[in-house]
């Protein structure tokens, strides 16, 4: 079995690429980073350091790489069995045109085998979004064949993969031992590939929101509250008892939405929260606050990790005071090397908190929640 994986970064190599390779899938990474592509195609292997209560170094083999802007990647799409991505939500729209070109040439080559495409991104229904973008670039004459032969499979992914510290080996990547990759089994075309570590569900949104409202919400709360107190890493921040209690409270607030929406068992979900708090405190992972907190505008989107759970608490009339504090802390985040953080701070200076909040999150500037966020923001300032 062959796969083309877009994104040869740390998550691509340390998570999806590794799971595919471990399942004896021949993986071709596609990336724009020429030195990375050159080294991967030369070495055809790399090391993954898995850290937790026990540490081990695994070697991933039988991989290669091509430039994602080249004809090579189009040729691979023509003949592959699977396409996966780990490029970040902002890049999906860019690679959509490449995938569309590959599909058109695949159909012209009369390849009638089914193909499944799975976007492994931190976004809700990311593959469905990718499908819509691909179809914009795919000539209408191919749409019926794509509908019949190409499965666009949504997924939920969870693994903490910080930047690697192996300066002597740029391909080596460090990952936590925990990983979760859940896919919507109803969206596959043809045979569903058997890949250990890829779990099937027919209720994907429950898992997507469980991860978004817990891991992602907790992670970003830790980052923004940690930044306020001058912490440099997620572990430093979560070992601050005051922050830990607030992060836990925020995850419980978002968890109440999940319990009401999907009928999750409260005890089981509380255990999931505790497990995530333990992952944040992993002493073997150096996860920088600025890595987690970057791109605050994206992370303040109405379908992302702070606003979506907040909207759920409004829908169900449940507690949200800690989530509101996290949102206020997001507007306090500064990072001169992050264009989104700079843009957000510029808007705050020019427009003030509530107009900026309304513009970037969609929350009504005159709502009770907006006024509370403003009050907390002024207290934090």
UniProtKB/Swiss-Prot annotation:
InterPro entries: 6-PGluconate_DH-like_C_sf, 6PGD_dom2, Mannitol_1_phos_5_DH, Mannitol_DH, Mannitol_DH_C, Mannitol_DH_CS, Mannitol_DH_N, NAD(P)-bd_dom_sf. One of its GO terms (biological process) is mannitol catabolic process. Keywords: NAD, Oxidoreductase. NAD(+) binds at residues 3-14. It catalyses: D-mannitol 1-phosphate + NAD(+) = beta-D-fructose 6-phosphate + NADH + H(+). Coiled coil: none annotated. It is an enzyme of class 1 (oxidoreductase). Belongs to the mannitol dehydrogenase family. NCBIfam families: PRK02318.1-2 (NF002646), PRK02318.1-3 (NF002647), PRK02318.2-2 (NF002650), PRK02318.2-5 (NF002652). This is Mannitol-1-phosphate 5-dehydrogenase. It comes from Photobacterium profundum (strain SS9). The lineage of its organism: Bacteria, Pseudomonadati, Pseudomonadota, Gammaproteobacteria, Vibrionales.
């Amino acid at each position: 079995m062959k796969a083309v994986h877009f994104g040869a970064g740390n998550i691509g190599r340390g998570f999806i690429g590794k799971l595919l390779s471990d399942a004896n899938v021949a993986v071709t990474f596609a990336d724009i980073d020429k030195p990375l592509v050159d080294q991967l195609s030369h070495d055809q292997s790399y090391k993954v350091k898995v850290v937790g209560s026990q540490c081990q170094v695994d070697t991933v083999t039988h991989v290669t790489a091509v430039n994602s802007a080249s004809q090579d990647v189009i040729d691979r799409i023509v003949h592959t069995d699977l396409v996966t991505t780990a490029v970040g939500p902002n890049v999906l729209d860019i690679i959509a045109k490449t995938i569309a070109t590959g599909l058109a040439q695949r159909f012209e080559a009369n390849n009638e085998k089914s193909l499944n495409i799975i976007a492994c991104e931190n976004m809700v229904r990311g593959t469905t979004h990718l499908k819509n973008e691909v179809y914009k670039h795919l000539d209408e004459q191919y749409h019926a064949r794509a509908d019949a032969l190409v499965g666009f499979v949504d997924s939920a992914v969870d693994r903490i993969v910080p930047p690697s510290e192996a300066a002597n080996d740029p391909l080596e990547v460090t990952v936590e031992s925990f990983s979760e990759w859940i896919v919507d089994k109803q969206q596959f075309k043809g045979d569903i590939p058997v890949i250990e570590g890829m779990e099937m569900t027919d209720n994907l949104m429950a898992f997507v929101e469980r991860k978004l409202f817990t891991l992602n919400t907790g992670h970003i709360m830790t980052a923004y509250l940690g930044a306020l107190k001058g912490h440099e890493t997620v572990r430093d921040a979560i070992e601050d008892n005051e922050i830990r209690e607030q992060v836990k409270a925020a995850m419980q607030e978002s968890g109440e939405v999940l319990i009401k929406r999907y009928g999750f068992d409260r005890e089981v979900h509380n255990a999931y929260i505790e497990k995530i708090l333990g992952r944040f405190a992993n002493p073997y992972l150096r996860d920088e606050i600025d890595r987690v907190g970057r791109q605050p505008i994206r992370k303040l989107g109405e379908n992302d990790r702070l606003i979506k759970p907040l909207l759920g608490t409004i829908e169900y009339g449940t507690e949200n005071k800690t989530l509101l504090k996290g949102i206020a802390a997001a507007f306090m985040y500064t990072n001169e090397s992050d264009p989104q953080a700079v843009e957000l701070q510029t808007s705050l200076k020019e427009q003030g908190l509530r107009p900026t909040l309304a513009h970037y999150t969609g929350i009504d500037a005159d709502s009770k929640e907006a006024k509370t966020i403003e009050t907390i923001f002024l207290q934090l300032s």
